[in-house]
A protein has these predicted regions:
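Conserved Rossmann-fold NAD(P)-dependent oxidoreductase catalytic core, especially the SDR/UDP-sugar
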Residues: 88, 92-136
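Active-site Tyr-X1-5-Lys
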Residues: 132-159
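Amphipathic terminal alpha-helices
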Residues: 297-305, 309-333
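N-terminal Rossmann NAD(P)H-binding glycine-rich loop of SDR-like oxidoreductase domains
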Residues: 3-23
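NAD(P)H-binding glycine-rich loop region in Rossmannoid oxidoreductase-like domains
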Residues: 35-39, 43-88, 96, 116
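A conserved pocket-lining segment of Rossmann-fold NAD(P)-dependent short-chain dehydrogenase/reductase
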Residues: 128-131, 180-203, 210-211, 215-222, ...
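Glycine/proline-rich active-site loop of Rossmann-fold NAD(P)-dependent oxidoreductases
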Residues: 142, 155-156, 167-177, 210-226, ...
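Mid/C-terminal beta-alpha module of Rossmann-like enzyme folds, strongest
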Residues: 214-281, 315, 319-322, 331
Length: 333
């Protein structure tokens, strides 16, 4: 099958591309930057921004399915950037699918689209979208997901996946930021005992292929969203510490009262808004909410409809992570 992966040069995108190639699919990708490593694998690479309707239209020509991974993530407060990438970009993909008669679309969403600031203990896909969001990222991802699911039809079967806190070898986002804050002594969590679930990169990528396979066969996933994680919820402190130790770092995780963290975040956000800064604030309410609440999910729907079953456990994933940097589990090597 000819598959276009938007954001194919990113952490998740590259993992999906490699798995598609491994099973014999013909793969193309659209990215804002050049990725010679993808071209070396035989991937047809298109340069362009997902918010550029013309670029997306051209990239979608001649493909049979799209896996839409490209997005702007983070706790930033400058809404126009998130609207352009996450809402307009997704609409561009939907329009291009319609124009070119593409039959299948798998959209990478986020569990944050249903996180309203409270605990989510084993929540399933019946969770509603909240009325208010703490940041533009979850708000725009929720709108994008709604559009994708609403567009599902006999002509274009769509579904959305909500992978949670993706990590693993090659991560250039979550883990580097975690290490930076730890080394600076700024890694503080409001509720270290709260359970959260994460997902290893290979499991997250494979779920996208399984979703595509469902759409091209039974189609039972069409018009639906699915939580994707490892199914191994752990206390916030434990998972942060184990990720740091896999990199040979000594965890310096500290506790801070939620009320204090939220008050500081509110002040910082106020300054960021006054200055109209487009960069991520050093502390944001969106981040505090996620570190102060439980969020792990019932994977029954993904297992039933997609055949999803995380192959790589957290323990094995940590071993692979340690091997990437030449560290033996639990310390430097």
């Amino acid at each position: 099958m000819k598959v276009l992966v938007t954001g194919g040069g990113g952490f998740l995108g590259q993992a999906i591309v490699r798995q598609l190639l491994a099973r014999g699919d013909t793969v193309s990708a659209i990215n804002r930057s050049a990725y010679p490593e993808l071209e070396a694998l035989g991937v047809t690479c298109h340069r362009g921004d997902i918010a550029d309707a013309k670029a997306v239209m051209q990239a979608c020509e001649g493909v049979e399915a799209v896996i839409h991974v490209a997005a702007k993530a983070g706790p930033g407060l400058y809404a126009p950037d998130f609207v352009a990438a996450n809402i307009d970009g997704t609409q561009n993909v939907l329009n291009a699918c319609g124009e070119h008669g593409i039959r299948y679309l798998v959209h990478t969403s986020s569990p944050s689209v249903v996180h309203g600031g409270g605990d989510i203990d084993g929540g399933d896909e019946s969770l509603p979208y909240p009325d208010h969001f703490a940041a533009p990222y979850p708000a725009t991802k929720a709108e994008a997901e709604k559009r994708v699911l609403a567009a599902s039809s006999d002509n274009l079967k769509t579904c959305a996946l909500r992978p949670h806190l993706i990590w693993g070898p090659g991560d250039n986002q979550l883990l580097p930021r975690l290490i930076e804050k730890n080394r600076a002594g700024r890694l503080r969590v409001p509720a270290p005992e709260k359970l959260i679930d994460t997902v290893f990169i290979d499991n997250a990528a494979r779920a996208h292929l399984q979703a595509l396979d469902n759409l091209t066969t039974s189609g039972t996933a069409a018009g639906k969203a699915y939580f994707i994680s490892n199914g191994e919820p752990l206390p916030v402190y434990d998972i942060l510490s184990r990720l740091l130790e896999a990199y040979g770092e000594t965890p310096r995780v500290r506790t801070v009262p939620k009320s204090v963290a939220m008050a500081v975040a509110t002040v910082v956000e106020g300054i960021w808004r006054v200055l109209k800064k487009r960069s991520d604030p050093p502390l944001a309410r969106f981040v505090v909410e996620h570190l102060a609440t439980a969020h792990w999910y019932d994977l029954s729907a993904a297992k039933r409809d997609l055949g999803y079953d995380p192959e790589v456990s957290i323990a094995e994933g940590l071993e692979r992570l340690a091997a990437e940097v030449g560290v033996t589990a639990g310390g430097t090597g």
